[in-house]
């Protein structure tokens, strides 16, 4: 889990395609892990517990989740739905220093394969267009029938006096339920747009895939957002990566692959293929006698995101019993017979792999993630965060 994340799905270690059951399971697991009773005196765990509960409160509610997926968290916080959509309330950042334009936001999930192989992807967006039949007023007489209670603001301010103090409380207008128009004039609603003032249609558009998709995942489509004050505002597409089997993301934004091997392969060597999302086949070679340490992470240069490093770690299935052959010569072949079977057979020597896609583990840079090992090289340790464990090697659930 990325503890700095503000995306509600990432906080729960999920993607936007997660089912209701996935959300329930992830919430229960993380709530137990970060519960204050188990993390006394740990302010980071306490803060994470709050984030987990907040994320669950939105994603476990189907209506709130729908609004969040379409418009973002600001829309949920302002209690918006399709009938009371208020872009002004939703995007208050327009009025903050340095923000010149109002923007809507939507999320789009992209696979690792598409990220590595495509420069553009097709995104289906909902486009607002002015209703010409009512001149965008929502009424057949083309007049703006604003709510008489709130004067078209959708909200009212009530004052509560408490002694010498006056408290102001902002609420949805009771006259129009936040819809801003005179609800008593429904008989004048435009039949074409059903009183919305706009017509919605779906449009498929080509969008550039961000190169630095983790730190800068946004692409802005000018004039493709909701209809506000007589024009379409800009639409911000936020790309979210969906990870393939075996691939995850570390806390410091490194792509990591977990290879599963059996005990004999940790000592007797192997030749295995990683199906990289770029379409390349990466040949991983361990020579007989090279010992695979489950605490080590191996670094594959230029095979990660943004041409960065790909991390490779191993999950080792240990044998329950070892059978020592009698009167056998001690060699790797007989050692493997004693230790058990391989996880998968080795690939052949000649499979046509490009030289730059062949990685011998004995020649790769390594990170030792074992905090109890004091023999680590200090320079290597500091390069990856120090303190006996490289910074960010922990993986977010996907």
From Swiss-Prot:
<feature type="repeat" description="CXXCXGXG motif">
    <location>
        <begin position="147"/>
        <end position="154"/>
    </location>
</feature>
<dbReference type="InterPro" id="IPR036869">
    <property type="entry name" value="J_dom_sf"/>
</dbReference>
<dbReference type="GO" id="GO:0006457">
    <property type="term" value="P:protein folding"/>
</dbReference>
<protein>
    <recommendedName>
        <fullName>DnaJ-like protein R260</fullName>
    </recommendedName>
</protein>
<keyword id="KW-0677">Repeat</keyword>
<dbReference type="InterPro" id="IPR044713">
    <property type="entry name" value="DNJA1/2-like"/>
</dbReference>
<feature type="compositionally biased region" description="Acidic residues">
    <location>
        <begin position="371"/>
        <end position="382"/>
    </location>
</feature>
<dbReference type="Pfam" id="PF01556">
    <property type="entry name" value="DnaJ_C"/>
</dbReference>
<feature type="domain" description="J">
    <location>
        <begin position="7"/>
        <end position="72"/>
    </location>
</feature>
<dbReference type="Pfam" id="PF00684">
    <property type="entry name" value="DnaJ_CXXCXGXG"/>
</dbReference>
<keyword id="KW-0143">Chaperone</keyword>
<feature type="repeat" description="CXXCXGXG motif">
    <location>
        <begin position="131"/>
        <end position="138"/>
    </location>
</feature>
<dbReference type="InterPro" id="IPR008971">
    <property type="entry name" value="HSP40/DnaJ_pept-bd"/>
</dbReference>
<keyword id="KW-0863">Zinc-finger</keyword>
<dbReference type="InterPro" id="IPR002939">
    <property type="entry name" value="DnaJ_C"/>
</dbReference>
<dbReference type="Pfam" id="PF00226">
    <property type="entry name" value="DnaJ"/>
</dbReference>
<feature type="repeat" description="CXXCXGXG motif">
    <location>
        <begin position="190"/>
        <end position="197"/>
    </location>
</feature>
<dbReference type="InterPro" id="IPR036410">
    <property type="entry name" value="HSP_DnaJ_Cys-rich_dom_sf"/>
</dbReference>
<dbReference type="InterPro" id="IPR018253">
    <property type="entry name" value="DnaJ_domain_CS"/>
</dbReference>
<dbReference type="GO" id="GO:0030544">
    <property type="term" value="F:Hsp70 protein binding"/>
</dbReference>
<keyword id="KW-0479">Metal-binding</keyword>
<feature type="zinc finger region" description="CR-type">
    <location>
        <begin position="118"/>
        <end position="202"/>
    </location>
</feature>
<dbReference type="GO" id="GO:0008270">
    <property type="term" value="F:zinc ion binding"/>
</dbReference>
<dbReference type="InterPro" id="IPR001305">
    <property type="entry name" value="HSP_DnaJ_Cys-rich_dom"/>
</dbReference>
<feature type="region of interest" description="Disordered">
    <location>
        <begin position="364"/>
        <end position="398"/>
    </location>
</feature>
<dbReference type="GO" id="GO:0051082">
    <property type="term" value="F:unfolded protein binding"/>
</dbReference>
<dbReference type="InterPro" id="IPR001623">
    <property type="entry name" value="DnaJ_domain"/>
</dbReference>
<keyword id="KW-0862">Zinc</keyword>
<feature type="repeat" description="CXXCXGXG motif">
    <location>
        <begin position="173"/>
        <end position="180"/>
    </location>
</feature>
């Amino acid at each position: 889990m990325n503890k700095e994340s503000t995306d509600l799905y990432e906080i729960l270690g999920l993607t936007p395609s997660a089912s209701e059951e996935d959300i329930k399971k992830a919430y229960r697991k993380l709530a137990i892990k970060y519960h204050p009773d188990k993390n006394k005196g740990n302010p980071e765990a306490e803060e994470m517990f709050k984030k987990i509960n907040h994320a669950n409160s939105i994603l476990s509610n189907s209506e709130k989740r729908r609004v969040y997926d379409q418009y973002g968290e600001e829309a949920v916080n302002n209690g918006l739905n399709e009938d009371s959509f208020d872009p002004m309330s939703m995007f208050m950042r327009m009025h903050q220093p340095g923000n010149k334009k109002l923007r809507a936001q939507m999320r789009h999930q992209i696979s690792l394969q598409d990220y590595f192989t495509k420069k553009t992807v097709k995104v289906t967006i909902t486009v607002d267009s002015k209703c010409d039949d009512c001149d965008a007023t929502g009424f057949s007489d083309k007049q703006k029938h604003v709510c008489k209670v709130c004067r078209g603001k959708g909200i009212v301010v009530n004052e509560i006096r408490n002694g010498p103090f006056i408290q102001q409380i902002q609420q949805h207008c009771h006259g129009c339920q936040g819809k801003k128009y005179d609800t008593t004039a429904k008989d004048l609603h435009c039949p074409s747009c059903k009183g919305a003032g706009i017509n919605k249609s779906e449009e498929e558009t080509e969008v550039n895939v961000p190169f630095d998709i983790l730190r800068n995942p946004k692409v802005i489509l000018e004039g493709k957002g909701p209809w506000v004050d007589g024009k379409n505002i800009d639409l911000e597409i936020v790309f979210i990566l969906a990870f393939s089997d075996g691939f995850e993301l570390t806390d410091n934004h490194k792509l990591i692959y977990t290879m599963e091997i059996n005990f004999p392969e940790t000592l007797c060597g192997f030749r295995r293929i990683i199906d990289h999302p770029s379409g390349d086949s990466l040949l991983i070679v361990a020579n007989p006698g090279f010992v695979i340490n489950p605490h080590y992470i191996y670094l594959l240069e230029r095979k990660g995101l943004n041409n960065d490093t790909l991390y490779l770690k191993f999950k080792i299935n240990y044998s329950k019993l070892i059978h020592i052959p009698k009167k056998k010569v001690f060699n790797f072949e007989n050692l493997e017979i004693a230790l058990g079977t391989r996880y998968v057979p080795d690939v052949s020597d000649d499979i046509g792999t490009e030289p730059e896609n062949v990685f011998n583990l004995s020649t790769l840079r390594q990170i030792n993630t074992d905090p109890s090992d004091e023999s680590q090289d200090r320079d290597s340790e500091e390069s990856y965060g120090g303190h006996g464990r490289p910074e960010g090697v922990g993986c977010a659930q996907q």
